[in-house]
Swiss-Prot record:
UTP binds at S13, K191, T192, K193, P194, T195, Q196, K227. One of its GO terms (cellular component) is cytosol. Catalyzes the ATP-dependent amination of UTP to CTP with either L-glutamine or ammonia as the source of nitrogen. Regulates intracellular CTP levels through interactions with the four ribonucleotide triphosphates. It comes from Bordetella avium (strain 197N). This is CTP synthase. Residues 431-450 are annotated as: Disordered. Disulfide bonds: none annotated. One of its GO terms (molecular function) is identical protein binding. The active site is at C383 (nucleophile), H518, E520. Its EC number is 6.3.4.2. Homotetramer. Keywords: ATP-binding, Glutamine amidotransferase, Ligase, Magnesium, Metal-binding, Nucleotide-binding, Pyrimidine biosynthesis.
Length: 550
């Protein structure tokens, strides 16, 4: 039977529950256990697909096409299990499901209430998510409950977790609480009172944490840990100091050295083999001892909140690990390029334009792409970054003045990028869209395998085919492809059924690639990713061309 670890947070949000949960999962997996993770989000949105990146950060896309919380990206990067739609659910999905059942008459005329109907539905969703991995033979499911203890939105989830623990009995569930121990500079000391109150709030609900992960900007002294232990009624060895580090990939070792996995295994009645974190040690060693250094310019419009590009930033770090390179990422506001020009790009070793939506800042991105193309700077365009590369090429090389996307200019004289109106999803179902379709849940999403054109740069990177995840509404317009190809652009991959362009490249450029998919979602620190590794190697070569002494 699957055992559960519920991870909660207190005092403030954004403490790193997702990293903590993923790190614990990585340790347990290294001990031979079959582990999966779930994220429970207390907002009423059905999913984060239509939420602003400034509000929510990145939307992570799973293989089966679900738009999910960015923490699922951390989960996939830390353990081998692939996340699916059932690994992330929201209050909106829970209420939607309960209301459908009520309309069907499933509750036989009963008054539908938060307890038991909503809490029972949450428990069913949790069990379904746990059973989806390992052919239903999951040993441990780690369940991260979003929000902060004390918030009204999280109460049904916490109550459901309490009920699950009670119903399953002894050694079936454990609770790990992540909390903040702030340092007050004026007093020159760490303050434990917020943590004490947070645990008291959790105990009022009926949840007694097996371990406290105490976040601080420094190591927490033993006397402060003892104070937390006494007032929280948590054993001293289960009060864990979690301090700031320069890489999230150091967290598994930090937690293991303080025995968090032993505490959890004891609470669950498990006796797995010892942990083997040698892979994580090797990753950290590669991070701390690079042989090279490159500077990548990421040109976007959400650069004030880098969480919007979390998987992409991590993919570049992974490529650095596998090329023994320190990858410095400079986030450049595309509107700043529109105002000040491309002079600020001259020191970069490579340029990247990520995915995005909307017209704002697109001309700055196009200017950056033109700079990369004309100056032989390695360029990687992802999703919108590929579409804008095609627009730039159409305007300045193929002679299609005024070329644009119908997303930005519905009456463009040359709509080289246009709305996808019909395509086939993973199950073979034909999807149809138009400009009046709902925004939520209407994009082309999920993984798709596509053949690659022989003799291309894409083939040298991926091999004969590519299988990556998508999240977009617009595509390169096939009507214009012959004119673009005649001008020197190569479409190096297409979808097998609809013949939609998936990859483009410029053979006369040192390294210029655009991809309609999101390769960052499949990059992991263990394996890296062939596209990003090739990109970083091209950036190193670019740097050496500019400065042979570097």
């Amino acid at each position: 039977m699957t055992k559960y670890v519920f991870v909660t947070g207190g005092v403030v949000s954004s403490l790193g529950k997702g990293i903590a949960a993923a790190s614990l999962a990585a340790i347990l997996e290294s001990r031979g256990l079959q582990v999966t993770l779930l994220k429970l989000d207390p907002y009423i949105n059905v999913d984060p697909g239509t939420m602003s990146p400034f509000q929510h950060g990145e939307v992570f896309v799973t293989e089966d096409g679900a738009e999910t919380d960015l923490d699922l990206g951390h989960y996939e990067r830390f353990i081998s299990t692939k996340m699916r739609r059932v690994n992330n659910f929201t209050t909106g999905q829970i209420y939607e499901s309960v209301l459908r059942k009520e309309r069907r008459g499933d509750y036989l005329g009963k008054t539908v209430q938060v307890i038991p109907h909503i809490t029972n539905e949450i428990q069913d969703f949790v069990a379904r998510g746990a059973d989806s991995a390992w052919q239903g033979n999951t040993d441990v499911a780690i369940v991260e409950i979003g929000g902060t203890v004390g918030d009204i939105e999280s109460l049904p989830f916490l109550e459901a977790a309490r009920q699950m623990s009670l119903r399953m009995g002894r050694n079936s569930a454990a609770f790990v609480h992540l909390t903040l121990v702030p340092y007050i500079a004026s007093a020159g000391e760490l303050k434990t009172k917020p943590t004490q109150h947070s645990v008291q709030k959790l105990r009022e609900i009926g949840i007694y944490p097996n371990a406290l992960l105490c976040r601080a900007d420094r190591r927490i002294p033993d006397d402060e840990r003892a104070k937390i232990s006494m007032f929280s009624n948590v054993p001293l060895d289960a009060v864990i100091s979690v301090w700031d580090v320069d890489s999230i990939y150091k967290i598994p070792a930090m937690l293991h050295q303080q025995g968090v996995d032993n505490i959890v295994c004891e609470a669950l009645g498990l006796t797995p083999p010892p942990a083997d974190l040698s892979m994580w040690d090797n990753l950290v060693d590669a991070l701390e001892h690079p042989q090279h250094e490159v500077t990548i310019g990421m040109v976007g419009k959400y650069v004030d909140l880098t969480e919007s590009y979390k998987s992409l930033s991590e993919a570049l770090v992974h490529a650095g690990i596998h090329t023994r390179s320190k990858v410095k990422i400079e986030y450049i506001d595309s509107e700043d390029i529109e105002a000040r020009g491309t002079e600020q790009l001259k020191h970069l070793d490579a340029i990247l334009v990520p995915g995005g939506f909307g017209k704002r800042g697109t001309e700055g991105k196009i200017a950056a792409i033109r700079y990369a193309r004309e100056n032989g700077v390695p360029y990687l365009g992802i999703c919108l970054g590929m579409q804008l590369a095609v627009i730039e090429f159409a305007r300045h090389v193929a002679g299609l003045g005024g070329a644009n996307s119908t997303e930005f200019d519905p009456s463009a004289p040359h709509p080289v990028v246009a709305l996808i109106t019909e395509w086939m999803d993973r199950e073979g179902k034909v999807e149809k869209r138009d400009t009046n379709s709902d925004l939520g849940g209407t994009m082309r999403k999920g993984a798709q395998r596509c053949p690659i054109k022989p003799g291309t740069l894409a083939q040298s990177i991926y091999g004969d085919d590519v299988n990556e995840r998508h999240r977009h509404r617009y595509e390169v317009n096939n009507v214009y492809v012959p004119r673009l190809e005649a001008a020197g652009l190569v479409i190096s991959a297409r979808t097998p059924t609809e013949n939609l362009p998936e990859m483009m490249e410029l053979p006369n450029h040192p390294w210029f690639v655009g991809v309609q998919f999101h390769p960052e979602f499949t990059s992991t620190p263990r394996d890296g990713h062939p596209l990003f590794s090739s990109y970083i190697r091209a950036a190193l070569e670019s740097k050496n061309r500019r400065d042979p002494q570097a």
